């Protein structure tokens, strides 16, 4: 009999699945997301940065971008190595078979090479989550890990379930088992993405990790509450919400990439780095325009209206200290 982890499919989950299925239709009907290389690249940077930032990596999104582009980055060597390893994995993300334990071990080895001594192997010791010296969560005993992972992959490969739900269940159960000595969080998030993409390819290009990072406390709370309930239902609901939010954000971005912005606004957008505040003069210099009125009308205002950039002092638009940040 095929193993099934404990969870319930309630009305909330069904409604969220229905909402995602409706949005999948929108993705299918619009221009192929894979034909938008700038958006794909931007989202890949977000995925790598966010998944590692959740694990306390201190490098910024722009530093991750520089490493992807082969530039020199100054920072903690461990953090740089984590990003470099993640880049190697994400370069081959479409080659990953998420239904294979062999691939799980293979890509864990790439992700954690030179970071842990047992990269690519299940843990040999006990692990847990601690607050000071108090154990908040203790993972199952080491000798149970192989059997628990076999059960999880039995569910993954043989139980008939909607992939949206199944991928969330896998993510939660994987984190509960904590099969590796380190790297469990980033592997769980990566393999959920690969499971989703095995059904709908555009999921490769959705930075769900960025929403998880934004709601990191809620992410851990959903895991903790599911642990207490002994079922992954709460976590499934959280992750489905994260997927919905990511899809909405990506649809918005894709519409901008595919022509709803003027050529001038797109030009300004391409020369800005995310999270860096710019003055009006700096922005005008970047696009090579001298007329402040023309710049405001054709470049700046369309991006402000679309929500692609925002003011640092929105309540005082004309402030001399006003800066603009790409979101």
Regions of interest found by a model, annotated:
Residues 1-327:
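FIC/Doc superfamily catalytic core
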